[in-house]
Amino acid sequence: MQTPRLYRVILPVADIERATAFYGVVFGTPGQRISPGRHYFNCGGIIFACYDPEADGDGEQGGWRLHPLQYLYFAVPDLEDTLARVQTAGGIIVADIDTMPWGERLFYARDPFGSPVCFVDERTLFTG
């Protein structure tokens, strides 16, 4: 059996316009508006979807809560440039660039909605 391929990750957001602006600056691409409350960014063949249920007419879905350590990890070619983009776009740096014991160079941040995100130097990815 072939291993399933991850193709989309959905991040609930409270304001689709702010999310689009933030991730557009951080990723350096405008992405694509799919519906009033969905905006997609192609991240190396995997869709990163910002989803605002209110803007999409879905209302309160209830029950889902973000765990503070539930990070989304993005591999990037230039860690320092990405850190600057996150700051410029209004993100909060939680932990500055550091090297983990397993060799990854990365930094932790929060987007404007408090969602935890991590950016890893693509040359140092540890995949097990």
What positions do the PLM features span?
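Short glycine-/small-residue motifs
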Residues: P116-F119
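Vicinal oxygen chelate
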Residues: M1-Y7, G28-A75, D81-R110, D121-G128
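Conserved active-site tyrosine of GNAT-family acetyltransferases
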Residues: A19-G24, V86, G114
